[in-house]
């Protein structure tokens, strides 16, 4: 269901996008969305990746969020309210994305990091359903803020892909504010974005090329940069990790002297080095997450 729900939501959203410009194609996409959704209902549970030679894989443990988004997307694609009931049932099964409030997690254990399904249910739901979805978002935000007792107002766990979690927190805070008009988390939303753009212990933006006049990674773990010399503008990096994680990863080593050594003395570390795949690798899903958030913010101006 964790994979089928993702497919159902992708095809369902695409069916809506192409409904007017290419109705025949839209119908085919809708059929595939429904087929994927049925598969997920028939096979509840998770489908983890199976690595060939890599020592690491994506250890996803949750699936209700995927089926919730799949069902909510089918509400828009089909107009059938029965899918809304399914989505609400899944939302109630996992009201808060489990990493929120935790200090650690396995690699991609609770994915996606942000549950957009709650927002999609809110868009289609009754007043009572809208209020419940907003309360689910609020509970998650409160859990993270409860751990943000530091100068950077950061309450996320610094596991692998911490930038993903940071962007996801900011996304959820933004959507909660949009849904409710409640600004109580706005300073933490801003702090998360500030962190990604360079207001962090290293003074380094976690987004390559942004801001243009700022400090960002020039030696990321990316073959396009290391072999072709091309800048991956807009790519969001994994971000800092706990020292304990970095120190125990296999096959990792710095190729150059650590230019940020004076700032890597605490419990989290970051290196702008092609050899550090844990903190300096551009990530596609995180970049997509951030693109969604930045686009929403631009549209709201």
For the regions a language model picked out, list residue spans one by one.
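A ubiquitous short alpha-helical element
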Residues: 56, 102-103, 156-159
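N-terminal carbohydrate-binding/catalytic regions of secreted carbohydrate-active enzymes
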Residues: 20, 26-30, 45-64, 86
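Aromatic (Trp/Tyr) and acidic
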Residues: 1-6, 10-14, 54, 60-89, ...
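Zinc-dependent metallopeptidase catalytic helix centered on the HExxH motif
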Residues: 100-109
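A conserved hydrophobic secondary-structure block that centers on an alpha-helix together
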Residues: 1-36, 43
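Acidic/His metal-coordination segments adjacent to aromatic residues that form catalytic metal sites
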Residues: 47-52, 96-100, 145-156
């Amino acid at each position: 269901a964790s994979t089928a729900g993702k497919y159902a939501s992708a095809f369902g959203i695409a069916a809506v996008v192409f409904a007017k410009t290419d109705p025949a194609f839209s119908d085919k996409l809708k059929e595939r969305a429904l087929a994927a959704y049925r598969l997920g209902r028939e096979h509840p549970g998770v489908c983890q990746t199976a690595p060939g030679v890599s020592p690491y894989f994506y250890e996803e443990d949750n699936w209700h969020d995927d089926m919730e988004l799949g069902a909510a997307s089918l509400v828009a694609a089909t107009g059938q309210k029965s899918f809304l009931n399914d989505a609400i049932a899944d939302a109630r099964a996992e009201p808060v994305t489990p990493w929120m409030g935790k200090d650690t997690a396995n690699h991609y254990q609770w994915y996606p990091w942000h549950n957009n399904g709650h927002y999609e249910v809110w868009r289609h739901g009754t007043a009572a359903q809208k209020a419940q979805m907003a309360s689910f978002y609020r509970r998650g935000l409160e859990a993270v803020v409860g751990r943000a007792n530091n100068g950077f107002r950061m309450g996320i766990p610094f596991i692998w892909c911490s930038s993903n979690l940071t962007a996801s927190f900011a996304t959820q805070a933004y959507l909660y504010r949009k849904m409710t008009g409640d600004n109580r988390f706005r300073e933490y939303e801003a702090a998360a974005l500030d962190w990604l753009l360079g207001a962090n212990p290293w003074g380094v933006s976690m987004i390559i090329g942004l801001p243009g006049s700022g400090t960002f990674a020039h030696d990321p773990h990316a073959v396009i940069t290391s072999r072709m010399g091309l800048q991956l503008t807009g790519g969001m990096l994994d971000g800092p990790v706990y020292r304990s994680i970095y120190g125990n990863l296999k096959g990792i080593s710095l190729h150059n002297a650590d230019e940020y050594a004076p700032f890597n003395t605490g419990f989290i570390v970051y290196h702008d080095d092609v050899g550090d795949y844990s903190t300096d690798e551009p990530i596609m899903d995180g970049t997509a997450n951030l693109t969604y958030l930045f686009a929403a913010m631009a549209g709201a101006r």
